[in-house]
Amino acid sequence: MLCAVYKTRKKEGMYLYLPKKDNFADVPEPLMEMFGRPELVTILALDKRERLGLVDKQKLIDELTEKGFYLQMPPKEENLLETHRESLGLSKTPDKKF
């Protein structure tokens, strides 16, 4: 199975996977408006790949088959201040004292 992978300039790390190159017919219009002008990144041969980085291969295949597209969202950014406070045994956010 082949799929086309597109990126957006609107949000780094967001990718749209399609079962056919340049066939956006199954992608909802509001999603296309939010995604913006898609830029082709690559064509993947899913049968020849065991892993796909951050994407679950079986979920990708299922979504392409059922919905006709798959939207990969960027990974959640870690809040370094909250992580540091937790490592010190503090709450994630400081108490507000005015």
Swiss-Prot record:
Q: Which residues fall in a coiled-coil region?
A: none
- Sorted alphabetically, which InterPro entries does this protein's record hold? YcgL-like_sf, YcgL_dom
Q: Which SUPFAM superfamilies match?
A: YcgL-like
Q: Where is this region: Disordered?
A: 77-98
Gene3D superfamilies the UniProt entry points to: YcgL domain
- Residues annotated as domain YcgL: 1-85
The lineage's top-level taxon is Bacteria
Pfam families listed in its UniProt record: YcgL
> What is this protein's name?
YcgL domain-containing protein MADE_1012200
Name its species: Alteromonas mediterranea (strain DSM 17117 / CIP 110805 / LMG 28347 / Deep ecotype)
